[in-house]
Structures are given as structure tokens and as C-alpha cells.
Design a protein with these regions (language model features):
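Charge-dense, helix-prone N-terminal extensions
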Residues: 1-115
Length: 115
């Protein structure tokens, strides 16, 4: 069976990153029934209606997974970092720890409320 690019993105990651990303994927997709997962820019993006809400990626320097918020610059949250990004902010995750579910839901709520 041939994997789709979006599924391959998750499958090809080593553990524990694979499990962390898969759990994050499930959490985002279960956030709202209207969430749509799409493959853009060689990464999983999640749309709510026509709005790109967030994406999943791996930090190149450390290999840590993160949740990227598309219009994160409009969100003031101490856990979100911009680094050199102009529009996006990210929430770094520790693949060896349980996902901070309440924090992720809080940030998704803030992102979904943006215009």
C-alpha cells in the first residue's frame, strides 16, 4: 500500500517524535469537526473553514517537534515564540513528555478566534 505524503511525514519520523506528532495530529483533528488536514509546503497544515490555523513541523536545530500557529504574531501568549518569524509563532514540544493538552487547546482557541 502506498502512503500519502502527509502520512509518510509522520511515519518516517523516529520514535519518540513519531508518537508525539501522531498524538498532536489527532488532538488538532479532534479540536473541531470542521478542521481539515491538508498537505502544503511539504508539511501538514490544518484549516478551519478557509483559514489556515496551524501546522506541524520539526525544529531543524534541535529536532524537537512543534505546533506552528499561522497568525501567531497576533497572539500574546508566553509559551509561543516567534524567533525570526514575521507571521508565525511556535509552541515547542518535548517528544519524551506527555503533550500539554490544555495548553494546546488554549492556543488553538486563541488561534481560531483570530479574524
Amino acid at each position: 500500500m502506498m502512503l500519502k505524503d502527509i502520512d509518510r511525514f509522520f511515519w518516517e519520523k523516529p520514535e519518540p517524535v513519531r508518537s508525539c506528532l501522531s498524538a498532536l495530529r489527532y488532538l488538532i483533528k479532534s479540536y473541531d469537526p470542521a478542521i481539515e488536514e491538508v498537505w502544503q509546503y511539504s508539511t501538514p497544515f490544518y484549516r478551519l473553514g478557509k483559514k489556515r490555523l496551524c501546522y506541524i513541523w520539526i525544529e531543524k536545530k534541535t529536532g524537537r517537534p512543534y505546533l506552528g500557529i499561522v497568525n501567531g504574531k497576533l497572539i500574546d501568549h508566553p509559551q509561543l515564540i516567534a524567533e525570526k518569524r514575521l507571521r508565525m509563532k511556535i509552541l515547542l514540544l518535548d517528544a519524551g513528555e506527555d503533550l500539554p493538552v490544555e495548553l494546546i487547546m488554549e492556543i488553538l482557541n486563541m488561534a481560531a478566534a483570530l479574524p
